[in-house]
Amino acid sequence: RQRQMCIRDRMPCNPNIGGSSKGHLVREIDALGGQMGINIDKTFIQSKMLNKSKGPAVHSLRAQADKVNYSMEMRKTLQNTEHLTIRQAEVAEIITVPANSADGETAAVEKKDGQMVEINGELQKITGVKTVSGGVYHCKAIVLCTGTYLRARCLTGEMITYTGPNGLMAANHLTDSLKAHGIEMFRFKTGTPARVDK
């Protein structure tokens, strides 16, 4: 199976951005200087205003992307962003230390800044992540975007393949770390109907 570089720019499913449920999120990302809206403007093949028969409060713009071009454009953007270093590895474990290892004043400031988490009733400080290969990346905070990859499996008819979408590797170890940190896990099932080749 492949471990595709820069998976964060991939659009493996329905390649649209915006719409009724996610349009506000795209606008918030745009307001914060993010690239999603900018890149869809460069690569869309169709855009449509949804809910036009209703009031303006529920109007919502949705753009259909050329998913290959969107991926290439986003990858270019990421690779040319100053002060951004891209490392790729499968994370197996979130590393934390007890909050009481810092003095009380520091711990209080860090909790306010969102760098502290409560794990099994005890305040913990996130210090990094450990990869499957044993590498450690130290950090002050983690943004966790697992998508559909945690212990992923694809069902094709009666056949079960333990893999992520489109043959990409699943993240098979991170789930245990999240559970050990007191995070409750649920499995969601999505379905894609068979495509008819014209």
Predicted regions and their residues:
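Short acidic, glycine/serine/threonine-rich loops at helix termini
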Residues: 10-14, 96-98, 125-128, 153-157, ...
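Glycine-/proline-rich flexible loop or hinge segments
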Residues: 9-14, 51-61, 157-160
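Feature captures the FAD/FMN-dependent oxidoreductase FAD-binding
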Residues: 38-151
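Conserved FAD-binding subdomain of flavin-dependent enzymes
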Residues: 22-38, 180, 184
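Short, small-residue-biased leader/transition segments that mark boundaries at the very start
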Residues: 2-7
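Glycine-rich loop(s) and the adjacent beta-strand/alpha-helix scaffold that form part
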Residues: 144-196
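Generic structural signal for well-ordered, non-membrane alpha-helical segments
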Residues: 18, 22-25, 63-71, 167, ...
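Conserved N-terminal glycine-rich FAD pyrophosphate-binding loop of Rossmann-like flavoproteins
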Residues: 8-30, 157
